[in-house]
Amino acid sequence: MAREIALDHVRNIGIMAHIDAGKTTVTERILYYTGRSHKIGEVHEGAATMDWMEQEQERGITITSAATTCFWKEHRINIIDTPGHVDFTIEVERSLRVLDGAVAVFCGVAGVQPQSETVWRQADRYGVPRLAFVNKMDRMGADFNKAVQTMKDRLKARAIPAQYPIGAEEDLRGMVDLITRKAYIFNDESLGAEFEVLDCPEDIEAEVEEAREALLEAALEQDDTLMEKYLEGEEITIAEFKSCMRRAVISSAFVPVFCGSAFKNKGVQLLLDAVVDYFPSPSDTPYIEGLLPDSEEAAVRKPSDEEPFAALAFKIMTDPFVGTLTFVRVYSGVMESGTSVLNASKDRKERIGRLMLMHANKREDIKEVRAGDICAVVGLKNTTTGETLCDPNKPIILEKMDFPAPVIAIAVEPKTKADQERMGVALQRLAQEDPSFRVEVDHETNQTIISGMGELHLEIIVDRMMREFKVDANVGQPQVAYRETITQMVEHESKFVRQSGGRGQFGHVWLRLEPNEPGAGYEFVDGIKGGVVPKEYIPAVKNGVGEAMANGVYVGFPMVDVKVTLFDGSYHEVDSSEMAFKIAGSMGLKEGAMKAKPVLLEPIMDVEVETPEDYMGDVMGDMNSRRGQIQGMEDSGNNRLVKAQVPLSGMFGYATDLRSMSQGRATFTMQFGHYAQVPKSIAEEIKAKTTG
């Protein structure tokens, strides 16, 4: 079967933005104008086509990046809708990995908002070419030039207008295309589907010419010959101008800025034209790099149907009708339904079931996908996010995505026995869909602990458990894994004797307990000389000591970093047994440890906060109130990086507090550093709470 659309007519794009910049509305309008959606869905009515999970429709925020295919001017555009909330940056990471270009949507009133900075940094990391769209130009206080300036100041982006707005706020009528100098005036009656193309209005001609010169000079940096032609006073044609613009966008030399109001249906068609004109097609990337699974040598695949098949799974979703959907981006070759491919990341074969093109939550079955396509596959059993599917005879592993470690954990308990069984299945499914969400069972408390990227993230997980899997669960407070240790050396004698007629019990040991190096754990040393305790009983002593340590002596938390030496003792020919020595060892540890000045230890986290200078004082003051110790500060771009060590117990609710403290502009990472002694007054409080 021949290719339906030439590879150079394919565009894989994402739409990224801050939470309220109007990203979903922009996507909706694109679907409307490209004929994919017959009725425009408004987000604030809870009806947008892309926001198709129930939680999204209620909250009016986009959580899951749905992939949609549409057509514009004989080009196929695959759109990945990305979430704009800090807790969902994992989704943004995933979608950026498989895009060839991204439209960054900004609010005409607020300009660059906090999450835009985070997403922009992620796009920089993956080297994604960008266009910017300043939306909401019809709103009170909208200012195109100010919005462009915030992109320069906050994102350090080389943002250059490619359009000039005609009118502002409620008088916004359209915009001038700086390349052609034509004015586009939109007709409100036809929902903006019809517009007039006129000459540039005279009252803004001077501003338009000045802006056009700036754009032209930046574009011509891509071509020395054309630059010379321009400097010699010759006219640059529109085709030459556009070709330089395209090269500039693909090489990320600068970011052209467009404007409009998606809600008022102005400017979206011109944005689509820009996507087609300036963004790269898959064939503009010379090749994609990967590794050979056996030798880890570098290997490449060119974006061509003739190359061996290679694709990356970038998202997994559970669909109520067809089961698991795996979204893949095909980089090379052809994949047909009904064939077998290799999951090179796991070295397992996978059978390809149905292949589908997705339109938000409507779908179309297809027989095959080719290089450059994005589609959903039904029925993959072993493939998770970030893994490579490829030709079994030509294996390759494409780059693996890095996912951040979760920063918050809570315990969940099913309300009934029936919920218990369903909860296991639900959590396993959700963890498979989302690599930034982890599930583990705490062996000490037997609780199921779920951890993720923030409180909203876990709220939505619990919400989905209820809606999709009908699991009712109680959600606990976040818990800290405390530990105990000793602070001085002690020698202690322990004797376990039971004589009650017949065979008795006899075990007698001398133990030396010493504090061990932090992090060294429990160490047992056999120091018996001359067989005073027979060899066969020594493992029993070790087990008894180990069990007592697991249960703790001071508050009841497991003990760590203790060195225990068995150095003396005695036995009875008849009455001694493994059980007697195990009990003697256990008693010896408990009694000895209480004399060795036991203390409580708590996990100390290494925390890094990246914050704009304005919030530095608040962040530092807040750190101190959490018993944090500032380790150092450094510059990070136009932000400041604060490094601190903070007890985990002080970090609960931090994501939410930091967000409100910095209006969402500060970000933080946190990972386990080491255990340290809890101050005595706090240890006593914990003891009182725990032992009741």
Curated annotation (Swiss-Prot):
Any GO MF annotation of the entry: translation elongation factor activity
Pfam families in alphabetical order: EF-G_D2, EFG_C, EFG_III, EFG_IV, GTP_EFTU
Primary residence: cytoplasm
InterPro entries named among the record's database cross-references: EF-G-like_DII, EFG_II, EFG_III, EFG_III/V, EFG_IV, EFG_V, EFG_V-like, G_TR_CS
Amino acids binding GTP: 17-24, 81-85, 135-138
GO cellular component: cytoplasm
This protein's record includes keyword Metal-binding: no
Domain called tr-type G: residue spans: 8-283
PROSITE patterns: G_TR_1, G_TR_2
GO biological process, any: ribosome disassembly
Gene3D superfamilies xrefs: 3.30.230.10, 3.30.70.240, Elongation Factor G (Translational Gtpase), domain 3, P-loop containing nucleotide triphosphate hydrolases, Translation factors
Keyword Hydrolase: no
Subcellular location: Cytoplasm
Transmembrane segments: none
Domain of life assignment: Bacteria
Keywords, sorted A to Z: Cytoplasm, Elongation factor, GTP-binding, Nucleotide-binding, Protein biosynthesis
Family as reported in the entry's similarity comment: Belongs to the TRAFAC class translation factor GTPase superfamily. Classic translation factor GTPase family. EF-G/EF-2 subfamily.
Function noted in UniProt: Catalyzes the GTP-dependent ribosomal translocation step during translation elongation. During this step, the ribosome changes from the pre-translocational (PRE) to the post-translocational (POST) state as the newly formed A-site-bound peptidyl-tRNA and P-site-bound deacylated tRNA move to the P and E sites, respectively. Catalyzes the coordinated movement of the two tRNA molecules, the mRNA and conformational changes in the ribosome.
PANTHER family: RIBOSOME-RELEASING FACTOR 2, MITOCHONDRIAL, TRANSLATION ELONGATION FACTOR G-RELATED
Name of the featured protein: Elongation factor G
Organism this protein belongs to: Magnetococcus marinus (strain ATCC BAA-1437 / JCM 17883 / MC-1)
